[in-house]
């Protein structure tokens, strides 16, 4: 029996002065489109470490996680399904510089985001933030 199980991934919401950190993808899928710093968990790390590592690799910034924003199951990536853990974070060090699979990074006002946004889950998260909706992880597990 073969199972197609989702893999763990992390994304990070980093805000600064009412602007949000986004990365333009330098590789496919969604080449040239913008999204949150994110990536798949490696076997020897926690999901929190994944979030910190991916943000550093993609943006040059060192972050501190400040909270758990949401968890989504997604099939946005044609390569594999994922369980996406979305964290909130603040910058503690580093210089903003694209790296890894991003060719440009920057902070954008929520009311002036790039037109081409990668991944449906990123669009959902950013639309909620634009509406002022915060979805910190619920204390009640019922929807």
What are these regions, as identified by a protein language model?
Residues 1-20, 71:
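Conserved N-terminal beta-strand and adjoining loop/helix that marks the start
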Residues 5-7, 25, 101, 118:
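Surface loops and adjacent helix of pleckstrin homology
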Residues 7-9, 15, 29-31, 36, ...:
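Short connector loops at helix/strand junctions that flank enzyme active sites
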Residues 142-143:
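Short, charged, surface-exposed hinge/linker loops at domain edges
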């Amino acid at each position: 029996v073969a199972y197609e199980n989702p893999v763990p991934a992390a994304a990070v919401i980093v805000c600064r002065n009412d602007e949000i950190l986004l990365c333009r993808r330098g590789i496919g899928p969604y080449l040239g489109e913008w999204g949150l710093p994110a990536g798949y968990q490696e076997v020897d790390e926690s999901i929190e470490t994944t979030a910190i590592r991916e943000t550093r690799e993609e943006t040059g910034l060192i972050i501190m996680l400040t909270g758990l924003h949401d968890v989504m199951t997604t099939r946005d990536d044609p390569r594999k399904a994922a369980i996406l853990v979305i964290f909130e974070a603040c910058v503690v060090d580093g210089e903003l510089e694209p790296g890894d699979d991003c060719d440009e990074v920057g902070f954008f006002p929520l009311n002036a985001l790039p037109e081409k946004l990668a991944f449906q889950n990123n669009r959902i998260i950013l639309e909620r933030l634009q509406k002022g909706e915060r979805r910190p992880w619920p204390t009640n597990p019922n929807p």
